[in-house]
Amino acid sequence: MSLIDPRAIIDPSARLAADVQVGPWSIVGAEVEIGEGTVIGPHVVLKGPTKIGKHNRIYQFSSVGEDTPDLKYKGEPTRLVIGDHNVIREGVTIHRGTVQDRAETTIGDHNLIMAYAHIGHDSVIGNHCILVNNTALAGHVHVDDWAILSGYTLVHQYCRIGAHSFSGMGSAIGKDVPAYVTVFGNPAEARSMNFEGMRRRGFSSEAIHALRRAYKVVYRQGHTVEEALAELAESAAQFPEVAVFRDSIQSATRGITR
């Protein structure tokens, strides 16, 4: 029994593993590669060059690998690369890159991208991230591992969302979000750290306490960023988690959410 519905359209140049399932009315375009165990639902459009790894599931009405609407894009060959064990729910849109940046949009492993979310061109999504319904990432956005963006979160182009961070529903993010920080509002403001997420992921009580102190240094003591970074140096040398927090602030290119 074929795992590809006869009503699906598969370009001859597409490469599908033997056990890939494709539902009715879906279109798998030229230069699309799909790894083993992946399930493509009905009414999905996949456009290449796109590489999709193993054991992913893409639900109905999603558009994956479409050209970017960036006005600079003139049809140059660009890519979308998706890793393994991702779930892409209904109506998600993901665009390929532009040659002005990386020429590639990249999604890692074990991510949940919920209904009607959008991932813009040249964005990079790490591993174990959750993009809740209607989250929209502009172009060139980086989302680090274990970040959670709640429903209707909007992220400005070139922003970086730090590892283990959390955004509240409807947040409008225009600056970098440091690792572990919880933000909320329009415009988004730092509210606390994602301590619940840390506990669920097995962070030690010592590391959480050190991060709590580090947060106060940056956000509660009136320091400039440079002063806060200097004060965090000793703690960062002792706790890798604080080093990640400090590095995410130091490397911010758009300023940090305060």
Swiss-Prot record:
UniProt-recorded name of the protein: Acyl-[acyl-carrier-protein]--UDP-N-acetylglucosamine O-acyltransferase
Function: Involved in the biosynthesis of lipid A, a phosphorylated glycolipid that anchors the lipopolysaccharide to the outer membrane of the cell.
Classification lineage: Bacteria, Pseudomonadati, Pseudomonadota, Gammaproteobacteria, Pseudomonadales
Catalytic activity: a (3R)-hydroxyacyl-[ACP] + UDP-N-acetyl-alpha-D-glucosamine = a UDP-3-O-[(3R)-3-hydroxyacyl]-N-acetyl-alpha-D-glucosamine + holo-[ACP]
The keyword Lipid metabolism is annotated on this UniProt entry: yes
This protein's UniProt keywords: Acyltransferase, Cytoplasm, Lipid A biosynthesis, Lipid biosynthesis, Lipid metabolism, Repeat, Transferase
PROSITE patterns in UniProt: HEXAPEP_TRANSFERASES
Principal place of residence: cytoplasm
EC category name: transferase
CDD domains: LbH_UDP-GlcNAc_AT
